[in-house]
Amino acid sequence: MDYIIELIKYIILGIIQGVTEIFPVSSSGHLVLFSNLFLGGEDINATLTLFLMITNMGSFLALLIYYFKDVKELVVDSFNFVFNKEKRKEIIVQENISYAVKLIIAIVPIGIAGLLIKDYLPTNLLSIGISLIITSLLLFLVFLLRNKKFSNDITFKNAGVIGLIQMFAVFPGISRSGITLVGGLSQKIEIKKVMRFSFLCYLLISIPVSGLGLYDAIKNPGTMSDIPGFSLAFIFSFIFSLLTIKIMHKYVTVKNLIWFSLYALTVGLVSITLYII
């Protein structure tokens, strides 16, 4: 019975990761909060850190499937631009290589920030709560722009600004998808375009992160303490990420970002309250 309860915990963690990775409410913040509520307040140790990477891989696979056509076009046209002189002249190839470069520009800052400071960031309930409240305030500020016209395409300057803002997502509790929405919408870029750009950034970022996670698993096989549990979390993270991205693209608008703002505020206050008591 105890082991079944443990497996249920893994399933819940996978669902939390799948939903909160896509919605702008911070998956890292929710998973830290969950570990405190259901795992007896344990710190995020090597095993849990690896677990977070595995559930992230579930989200990665879901987004890769959802955006497979876009990813395929970007990869193929990038190779065509480099190796095929005739294809290089085609407008669509030039547009796709330009978009790929913008994605790279946008992920460089968070990559550097992650390497330099990620190991030194606090992951207690107080810091998580504060970060979630910051996420809430940023989403609310963008909500105030709901009556503005959003029509701009993403330029190299836009990508740079989004990248600099996205850098702050290394702080647990700051939603990466949320802060990229803020970065894009504040530059009057249409929300569907920002979402596509944001999640393609996530796919690029996840490749080295997942690679490091697999390396750590091979290097420290003891951290893979519960393969069935990890597998369940991966599966449920994948399923719920795929469901949530479909909901996100179909229903999320600038006007209803207020609900995510209120939700992040509520969870942030709960996190701070739990820290105090």
UniProtKB/Swiss-Prot annotation:
Family matches, as InterPro entries: UppP
Keywords: Antibiotic resistance, Cell membrane, Cell shape, Cell wall biogenesis/degradation, Hydrolase, Membrane, Peptidoglycan synthesis, Transmembrane, Transmembrane helix
GO CC annotation: plasma membrane
Known EC number: 3.6.1.27
Enzyme class: hydrolase
Pfam assignment, any one: BacA
Membrane topology: Multi-pass membrane protein
Localization: Cell membrane
Catalytic activity of the protein: di-trans,octa-cis-undecaprenyl diphosphate + H2O = di-trans,octa-cis-undecaprenyl phosphate + phosphate + H(+)
Domain of life: Bacteria
GO BP annotation list: cell wall organization; peptidoglycan biosynthetic process; regulation of cell shape; response to antibiotic
Record field: transmembrane: 3-23, 48-68, 97-117, 125-145, 198-218, 227-247, 257-277
Main location: membrane
A GO molecular-function descriptor: undecaprenyl-diphosphatase activity
Job of this protein: Catalyzes the dephosphorylation of undecaprenyl diphosphate (UPP). Confers resistance to bacitracin.
Further comment found in the protein's record: Bacitracin is thought to be involved in the inhibition of peptidoglycan synthesis by sequestering undecaprenyl diphosphate, thereby reducing the pool of lipid carrier available.
Similarity comment: family membership: Belongs to the UppP family.
Designated name of the protein: Undecaprenyl-diphosphatase
Gene responsible for this protein: uppP
